[in-house]
Amino acid sequence: MKFVLLFGVLLVTLFSYSSAEMFDDFDQADEDELLSLIEKEEARAKECTPRFYDCSHDRHSCCRSELFKDVCTCFYPEGGDNEVCTCQQPKHLKYMEKAAGKAKKFGGKIKKWFG
């Protein structure tokens, strides 16, 4: 009976040690993958198209504003047959950003009064 108990404890110890190493390997792989994704995102972020610039070459390349990403909007100018695409911020998102900015200011004042 003592032998079975000792053997069981040994098995549990070995199993926990091997699973801990396995989890460490997974954590390292996840960390490496996350770092590579962050590097790709930073490289892609440098190539964004500013607001009111031509985005016809890549319609998903518009830069972000404070809260939202600008949208590539295409239109035909008066008297022209060529389509023109520029990065623009939709009005409803512009108003939402203004409201969020005012709410942030108001929250700071309340914190100052009661904090």
Swiss-Prot record:
Any Pfam family hit: Toxin_35
Residues making up the propeptide: 21-44
Range of residues in the leader sequence: 1-20
Cysteines paired by S-S bonds: 48-63, 55-72, 62-87, 74-85
One term of GO molecular function: toxin activity
PROSITE patterns noted in UniProt: SPIDER_CSTX (PS60029)
GO cellular-component term (any): extracellular region
Family of the protein in this entry: Belongs to the neurotoxin 19 (CSTX) family. 01 subfamily.
Protein name listed in UniProt: U3-lycotoxin-Ls1k
Organism: Lycosa singoriensis (Wolf spider)
